[in-house]
Amino acid sequence: MNSLLMITACLALVGTVWAKEGYLVNHSTGCKYECYKLGDNDYCLRECKQQYGKGAGGYCYAFGCWCTHLYEQAVVWPLPKKTCNGK
């Protein structure tokens, strides 16, 4: 019984730690949201929260808004069968 409880607790913890992350994407163009102030960035944080909910985080990484703490079905860049501006 104790072993089952420990396994369940570990699986719940792993699910929490391994949340999805990725670049914020514009669904109409297929492009990443650009940013220029690397690191903590109010713009990226605001856009990630607006698109993915209050629990999401965001910062500027490699000149694109990187969102954290996303739900597993969240759509992030790159979009399947859609390239940025047809490139």
Swiss-Prot record:
Residues 20-85 form the LCN-type CS-alpha/beta domain. It is found in: Secreted. GO terms for molecular function: calcium channel regulator activity; sodium channel inhibitor activity; toxin activity. PROSITE patterns: LCN_CSAB. GO terms for biological process: defense response. Residues 1-19 form the signal peptide. It comes from the Eukaryota. The modification Asparagine amide is found at N85. The keyword Disulfide bond applies. Expressed by the venom gland. Disulfide bonds join C31-C84, C35-C60, C44-C65, C48-C67. GO terms for cellular component: extracellular region. Keywords: Amidation, Calcium channel impairing toxin, Disulfide bond, Ion channel impairing toxin, Neurotoxin, Secreted, Signal, Toxin, Voltage-gated sodium channel impairing toxin. Beta toxins bind voltage-independently at site-4 of sodium channels (Nav) and shift the voltage of activation toward more negative potentials thereby affecting sodium channel activation and promoting spontaneous and repetitive firing. This toxin had also a depressive action on the classical calcium current activated at high membrane potentials. This toxin is active on mammals. Has the structural arrangement of an alpha-helix connected to antiparallel beta-sheets by disulfide bonds (CS-alpha/beta). Belongs to the long (4 C-C) scorpion toxin superfamily. Sodium channel inhibitor family. Beta subfamily. This is Toxin Cll2b. It comes from Centruroides limpidus.
